[in-house]
Every structure is written in structure tokens, then in C-alpha cells.
């Protein structure tokens, strides 16, 4: 997806229904917001969190969109906007004592990465 904002071209990539808590993903997203593409790749590769893998896929997808569709060089890209939104809850039941059922909610999240080029 493309956005024109103050004559700057912004390239967007979305990751939907990621089976992870938005709170845990935000912890990693806050570390890469505003950084260059290469620096974000290095951080996401070596951080010890499970949330890094889906974020890395979305960041790589946004960079591939920018380079393939608009001819941007990956060395000039930076993450101008990164956000995590709450997705739908998967509701499950866990069997408990005496025939009861205990509700369990499995959260999901949406990851949005916006990349622009420094010129």
C-alpha cells in the first residue's frame, strides 16, 4: 500500500492475525521505530524475543515492496512508523475439576510497518 504524505512516498506492510499478545510485540516494535532498515534487521535478528520473527517478516516485506515497486535502495530506507494493534481473540475452554470449563483467551495482533526513503 502506498501513501503520499507531504511529498514523501510511504510504503506500508501489514501482518494480520499474528498469534501473539500485542503487549509483547510492542516491546520489540518500540526498539525499531525510527531506525534505518539495516539497523532494524540487525536488532531483530539478535534480540532474544519470540516476537522478533513475525516483525522481521513484515519489515522485510515492506522493504521488498519499496525496492521492487518504487525502485528505492534498501540502504536509504528507514522505519518511519511502526505500530501494533489488537486483533481478534481466540476463545478456548480448558477442562477443570468437577466438569467445569475454564475460559482461555488467545490474543492476536496486527503489525503495521511504514517505510520511507531518506533522500
UniProtKB/Swiss-Prot annotation:
Keywords from UniProt, A to Z, are: Chloroplast, Plastid, Ribonucleoprotein, Ribosomal protein, RNA-binding, rRNA-binding
In the record, what terms sit under GO molecular function? rRNA binding; structural constituent of ribosome
Enumerate the Gene Ontology biological process terms.
translation
Q: Its encoding gene is what? A: rpl22
Q: Report what the protein is called.
A: Large ribosomal subunit protein uL22c
Indicate the quaternary assembly. Answer: Part of the 50S ribosomal subunit.
Alphabetical list of Pfam families matching this protein:
Ribosomal_L22
Note the CDD domains from the entry.
Answer: Ribosomal_L22
Compartments reported by the entry: Plastid, Chloroplast
Instruction: Describe the family membership recorded for this protein in Swiss-Prot or TrEMBL.
Output: Belongs to the universal ribosomal protein uL22 family.
Record keyword Protease present: no
Q: What does this protein do?
A: This protein binds specifically to 23S rRNA.
Q: Which GO terms describe its cellular component?
A: chloroplast; large ribosomal subunit
* InterPro entries hit by this protein: Ribosomal_uL22, Ribosomal_uL22_bac/chlpt-type, Ribosomal_uL22_bac/org-type, Ribosomal_uL22_sf
Instruction: Tell me which Gene3D superfamilies the record gives.
Output: Ribosomal protein L22/L17
Amino acid at each position: 500500500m502506498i501513501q503520499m504524505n507531504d511529498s514523501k512516498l510511504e510504503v506500508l506492510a501489514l501482518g494480520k492475525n499474528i498469534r501473539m499478545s500485542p503487549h509483547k510485540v510492542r516491546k520489540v516494535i518500540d526498539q525499531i521505530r525510527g531506525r534505518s532498515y539495516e539497523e532494524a534487521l540487525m536488532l531483530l535478528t539478535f534480540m532474544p524475543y519470540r516476537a522478533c520473527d513475525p516483525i522481521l517478516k513484515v519489515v522485510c516485506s515492506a522493504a521488498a515492496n519499496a525496492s521492487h515497486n518504487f525502485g528505492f535502495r534498501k540502504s536509504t530506507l528507514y522505519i518511519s512508523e511502526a505500530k501494533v494493534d489488537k486483533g481478534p481473540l481466540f476463545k478456548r475452554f480448558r477442562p477443570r475439576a468437577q466438569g467445569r470449563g475454564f475460559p482461555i483467551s488467545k490474543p492476536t495482533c496486527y503489525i503495521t510497518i511504514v517505510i520511507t526513503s531518506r533522500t
